[in-house]
Amino acid sequence: VCRKMKKYVTTSLETHLFFTRSMREHALFLLTAFPAGETGYRNKADWFRAQFEKALEQAVWLADGMVGEEVLCSGEVFTEFTEMAEQQTRRLTKIPIDIRITQAEKKLHAGCEICQDRRMIQQVRRLNQNVLYLLNGLIAFKEKILQEVTACNLYTVNYPLLIEHILREAKLYHQILTELEEKGCMPSKNLKNAELFWNQIMMEHALFIR
């Protein structure tokens, strides 16, 4: 049981360290791409940005001593450019970005010292369930934006492909958390599909840069 719970806690937190940051950034992309007059869409995007920032902060707080060394050193959680990019984005957009979260991530330690701590398991489960709730709303929001943009009823500087792109990432995050909550782990059969998914995502990143 301890090994299964350790895997559940570690995989959940490693997933959150990567994806909550991405979801916060996606909400930021949506927010900055709407015209000033679209206050409803802008306010909703900003709400999601703030909520996922809180979720990221919670994940970082729980992750110390609970995640793998490979993940912390992979560049998936942060890079040498992350803090500087956040500072510049905050300066240019005037949107509050809590840089202290990245600073805390740099101090994270690897390991799993308290895998039998029921309180930790409960906290991770609550975080998973809260993020699933947020993802349901964010996915619906992105789907509505995509529908309105493709119907020429809403202006945004984001290309439809970018909106589809960040929608797929949110759905993958939701799928991973759902499987963790239902099974306690990620089935190995999904590894091939994950590789294919990220190959497509990276190709689209290259298209956006071009």
PLM-predicted stretches and their roles:
Residues 2-210:
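Surface-exposed peri-terminal alpha-helical interaction modules
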